[in-house]
């Protein structure tokens, strides 16, 4: 029984992409650099020529707004968010994120990728 449980947990974990691996692949495709350290000691997930991008799973969309704006200020670039939509998401977090951005006219560009 323990072997079956361990086997199940192992394959569940390898089936889920990590935020870091998604960021590395996506950021590279955009011509950006990952984990850029700011003068504040914080790390931008993906820094491109024009954008400082926070990469976050959909359920953490609220936190991504503040981080994206902070990274933009720290780098002098525009703010961006890469929202990772999880396969098991039952809530439209992208809709919620866009509602806040639009209501307050926040200068954030949103990108979406699937898990």
Provide a role label for each language-model segment.
Residues 58-113:
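Catalytic cores of nucleic-acid endonucleases
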Residues 13-49:
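Acidic-basic catalytic patches of nuclease active cores, encompassing PD-(D/E)XK
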Residues 3-13:
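Sec-dependent N-terminal signal peptides
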Residues 30-33, 48-51, 74-78, 106:
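Short glycine/proline-enriched coil/turn segments at helix->beta-strand junctions
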Residues 31-33, 56-59:
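Short, flexible loop segments at the rims of nucleotide/cofactor-binding pockets, characterized by
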Residues 40, 113-115:
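Residues that form or immediately flank small-molecule/cofactor binding pockets and catalytic motifs
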